[in-house]
Amino acid sequence: LYQPNLEWMQKLTRTATGGGIKIGPASNFLQKFPGCEIELISLHGECREATVWFGSMAGPHTFRATVLPAGESLSEDPLSAWTNTTPTSCAYLFDPDPAIVRSGLLDVMAERNNLLRLDAEEEYLTADQIPTTAFVTAFKIEAVLSNSVKELKHYLRQSPSQHYEVKCRRISIEADVVRRQLPTGAEPPRVIIFAKVAGRGAIVVAHRITGAS
């Protein structure tokens, strides 16, 4: 529930000269504040805050995403862009910042950075080059396997890693259960990403790239 109540806040956005109302990032704010700009703010990869900017403080677009501590910000209408999908993954996979996803600006950001969707229903993106933006975390793709933990285990036995980071968005898995099943060895850490690729479930074996954005 909103506190103060929603009606009070809506009236404030219509009558005050300008200002901002801080609300929870998980709030149901869609279509609740017409004529305002809603900013989603993330800190260290976690969406922490949403602010409804109104009057003289509002920007020209409906949504804004800001990532901290980088300070990069993007403001646009979420419906102004639509990112193409690709039948196969490229050299890199990108995990978008939660502020971009929550604000609905994923396609806008992807289009501006020449990124493609792995699937129309999947937030993971791909490209052959790493963009200069703080809105994504980059991973170098080593292999793309079918959505089979058995196949994944067989692949990793050839050169098992010291540690595995397991990630997913649209494919529901129990990361800890999967991690415990994977063979360990002396190779550098890997990231195991369960994702939809061109309409099918897949497992992407990758390496996290630090300092790419």
Language-model regions, residue ranges each:
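SAM-dependent transferase fold signal centered on methyltransferase-like domains
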Residues: 1-213
